[in-house]
UniProtKB/Swiss-Prot annotation:
The lineage of its organism: Bacteria, Bacillati, Bacillota, Bacilli, Lactobacillales. It comes from Streptococcus thermophilus (strain ATCC BAA-250 / LMG 18311). This is Large ribosomal subunit protein bL34. One of its GO terms (biological process) is translation. Keywords: Ribonucleoprotein, Ribosomal protein. Residues 1-44 are annotated as: Disordered.
Length: 44
């Protein structure tokens, strides 16, 4: 059986990257929450 996680850098960036987060209101909310929490890495 094939595993479900088949890593792809492009797909990862397009779905979870910083620019994608910035492109929506809720995405910006996610970044703000991660900044507030003090995360070292904000997005994939």
């Amino acid at each position: 059986m094939k595993r479900t996680y088949q890593p792809s850098k492009i797909r990862r960036q397009r779905k979870h990257g910083f620019r994608h987060r910035m492109s929506t209101k809720n995405g910006r909310r996610v970044l703000a929450a991660r900044r507030r929490k003090g995360r070292k890495v904000l997005a994939a």
